[in-house]
A protein has these predicted regions:
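Catalytic cores of DNA base-excision repair glycosylases
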Residues: 35-290
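Polybasic, lysine-enriched low-complexity intrinsically disordered terminal tails
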Residues: 1-41, 288
């Protein structure tokens, strides 16, 4: 028998204290920079965009949306304008009409203030299946007046091929029934089509509230503080769309008025400050402007 008493209580080893589980760091919500900018602008400079548009409309007049071309023609014409003068792109498009006639009803392309050419004469859209199937050397020769033909001809055919493979034909009318951002996302899956090109098509063909930001829009917007001075074009595009979310019906007006102002008064060199109705908010005139 153990020398210990039978009634003695057995000793127990104290349990080690469990280590506290490390606290998980709360995931930081990802901030949308475009929305953040729009909210900041609304807080510190309320009505800046609306007041700017009102001031510009007082000298350039009201801007009414009107469809120019069918969406496939608009897309091809926009591709032809890339790194080329609008007047040269018009020559190339007219040459496409003549070389590949479709026999469809005529369209009228009236140039707006954002268009640097003379506008297209009335004419039917080209026969897109024939353009896609044309020998490459032949197509290069047809669109040569537009400039950069060896680069643009294969791009045109690849774009038309992609549309046909996705949709069964070359029509882009279905984009009018899609939500604006979904339609833009679809277009930007096509190689060589960015946000600006897609937004131009969707705004001018369907009046979708998507803001194309070209060099004139960007220059005016940065000078008056609508977008940050160092914003890259894609971010500036998103910031504009965030600002216009409260009044999307003014998107076309905003695009046209800012282009008009950038061409006529707020030029890159020697802007005409004495004629500018928004010079009181321009950092180019006064670096301390609000």
């Amino acid at each position: 028998m153990s020398p210990k008493s039978a009634n003695s209580t057995p000793t127990t080893t104290p349990k080690a204290k469990a280590r506290p589980k490390p606290k998980r760091k709360a995931k930081r919500r990802r901030v949308n920079p475009a929305l953040a900018w729009a909210r900041r602008l609304a807080r510190y400079r309320p009505r800046l965009l609306e007041d700017t548009l009102d001031a510009l409309a007082s000298i350039y007049g009201p801007q009414v949306w009107r469809r120019r071309l069918d969406p496939t023609s608009e897309l091809i014409l926009t591709i032809l304008t890339q790194n080329s003068a609008d007047t040269n792109a018009e020559k190339a498009f007219v040459a496409l009409r003549a070389a590949y006639p479709s026999g469809l009803p005529d369209e009228i392309h009236e140039p707006g203030v954002g268009w640097g050419g003379d506008g297209l004469p009335p004419g039917a859209p080209p026969d897109w299946p024939a353009v896609e199937a044309a020998p490459l050397a032949e197509l290069i020769d047809v669109i040569r007046p537009g400039g950069l033909a060896p680069t643009k001809a294969p791009r045109l055919q690849a774009t038309l091929r992609r549309i046909r493979e996705e949709r069964g034909d070359h029509s882009l009318e279905f984009l009018g029934d899609m939500a604006p951002l979904a339609a833009r996302d679809w277009l930007t899956t096509i190689p060589g089509i960015g946000k600006k090109t897609a937004s131009v098509l969707l705004l001018f063909c369907f009046n979708h509230p998507l803001m194309p930001v070209d060099r004139h829009v960007e220059r005016v917007a940065k000078r008056i503080g609508l977008v940050p001075a160092k914003a890259l074009p894609d971010l500036a595009t998103d910031q504009f769309n965030a600002m216009l979310a409260g009044f999307p019906e003014r998107t076309y007006e905003a695009h046209v008025l800012l282009i008009h102002h950038g061409r006529a008064i707020c030029q890159a060199r020697s802007p005409k400050h004495d004629l500018c109705p928004i010079r009181d908010r321009c950092s180019f005139v006064d670096p301390k402007a609000p």
